[in-house]
């Protein structure tokens, strides 16, 4: 909701909940959906069709969540359908990961995006100074947002 003049943008998503949230804005953006195979666990479209659709576009920014953050490896997930996340990162000029600080250190088996694919991490103020420095040392800009009660 804090995206400013989002109505001036084109937004592509594979998530119905994101699409519905964008539709509720007073001035909604041009909205594109990936299509693909519905995954009830992630409540999003996945698979080869979605990947093919994404490959035909070029995006300025990718905003993506993460199930886990591994200081050594990057973002991690339980979801084995991580091909779409990787394609999204490939077709975007800037990859911005949004994840709460408590996701750091979760031991999750699947590497989603290595730090070398990520330009910015937006997290909360609970991220320790040590973790902040270690992630920035990997070439990632880290933004700590203030937590609201």
Residue ranges with predicted function:
Residues 12, 16-149:
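Conserved phosphate- and dinucleotide-binding cores of soluble alpha/beta proteins
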Residues 2-7:
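Short, small-residue-biased leader/transition segments that mark boundaries at the very start
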């Amino acid at each position: 909701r804090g995206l400013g003049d989002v109505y001036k943008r084109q937004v592509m998503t594979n998530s119905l909940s994101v699409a519905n949230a964008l539709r509720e804005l007073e001035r909604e953006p041009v909205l594109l959906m990936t299509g693909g195979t519905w995954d009830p666990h992630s409540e999003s479209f996945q698979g080869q069709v979605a990947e093919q659709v994404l490959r035909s576009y070029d995006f300025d920014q990718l905003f993506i969540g993460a199930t886990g953050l591994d200081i050594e490896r990057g973002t991690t997930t339980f979801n084995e359908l991580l091909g779409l996340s990787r394609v999204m990162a490939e077709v975007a000029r800037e990859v911005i990961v949004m994840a709460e600080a408590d996701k750091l250190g979760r031991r999750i088996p699947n590497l989603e995006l290595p730090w070398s694919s990520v330009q910015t991490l937006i997290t909360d103020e609970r991220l320790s100074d040590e973790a902040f420095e270690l992630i920035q040392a990997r070439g990632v800009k880290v933004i700590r947002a203030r937590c609201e009660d």
